[in-house]
């Protein structure tokens, strides 16, 4: 179900693709960033590719190897040849690369990935769009207030968007829980909105509702009991 945040993520990726630039999408977990990216990748299978970074794949070698596999580019033994192969595959195309959990990327990996947005100085072919998605650590690092190398990277960001749980809208809850909207169960919706706007985010609210639905009781009282049972705790109603 598209929400205001996942739709904004979708359009931001499209912007990076059209402008061949770097975009950073960051913020709280569980608000729909990855869902928006997944929808874009599904809708554009021929000119969009996504990879997800972990602490063990954040190095330059691991990152470009993941990218090569995603693009079906033959893997090379050294990093220079691998980057040349990637550029040969990407330059002049309308590809966009979406990197989730980008806060795990090391500086060298960030710099190489960013370079893919540059025009090729030899052929003049334009670069591609790159989208970094992660928690706000990725943007804080790129701001580089204390590290000149990150400050240089920061200056190449065309657009950044911050998504927090507080930005979840009542309309999002109506879309996510249509049964409650049909029943005009305002108290239930307000409670789920309070969960969405808490550190548990949309993901937490969805899990809460799913558990309540499994018990065949999505009443306000049962949602509240289920929240306490799940450790979500006492939340004030918005």
Predicted regions and their residues:
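Conserved Walker B catalytic segment
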Residues: 7, 91, 96-98, 103-133
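Conserved NTP-binding/hydrolysis module of P-loop NTPases
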Residues: 59-77
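Pre-Walker A adenine-sensing motif
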Residues: 2-17
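C-terminal alpha-helical "lid" subdomain
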Residues: 42, 152, 159, 163-238
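Conserved alpha-helical scaffold flanking the Walker A/P-loop in AAA+ ATPase domains
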Residues: 76-95
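Conserved AAA+ ATPase "SRH/arginine-finger" region at the nucleotide-binding site
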Residues: 51-56, 141-145, 157-171
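Walker A/P-loop nucleotide-binding motif
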Residues: 18-39, 55-56
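Sensor-1/coupling segment of RecA-like P-loop NTPase cores
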Residues: 24-29, 105, 119-149
């Amino acid at each position: 179900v598209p929400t205001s945040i996942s739709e904004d993520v979708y359009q931001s990726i499209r912007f990076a693709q059209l402008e061949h630039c770097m975009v950073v999408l960051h913020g709280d977990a569980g608000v729909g960033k990855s869902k928006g990216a997944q929808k874009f990748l599904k809708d554009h299978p021929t000119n969009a590719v996504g990879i997800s970074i972990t602490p063990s794949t954040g190095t330059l070698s691991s990152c470009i190897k993941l990218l090569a596999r995603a693009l079906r580019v033959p893997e090379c033994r050294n990093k220079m040849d691998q980057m040349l192969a990637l550029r040969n595959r990407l330059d002049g195309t309308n590809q966009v690369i979406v990197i989730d959990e980008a806060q795990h990327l090391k500086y060298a990996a960030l710099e190489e990935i960013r370079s893919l947005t540059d025009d090729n100085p030899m052929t003049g072919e334009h670069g591609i769009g790159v989208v970094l998605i992660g928690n706000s650590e990725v943007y804080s690092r790129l701001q580089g207030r204390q590290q000149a190398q990150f400050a240089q990277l920061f200056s190449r960001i065309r657009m950044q968007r911050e998504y927090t749980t507080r930005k979840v809208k009542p309309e999002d809850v109506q879309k996510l829980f249509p049964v409650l909207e049909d029943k005009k169960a305002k108290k239930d919706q307000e409670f789920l909105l309070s969960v969405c706007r808490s550190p548990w985010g949309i993901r937490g609210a969805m899990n809460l509702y799913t558990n309540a639905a499994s018990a065949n009781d999505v009443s306000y009282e049962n949602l509240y009991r289920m929240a306490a049972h799940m450790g979500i705790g006492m939340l004030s109603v918005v």
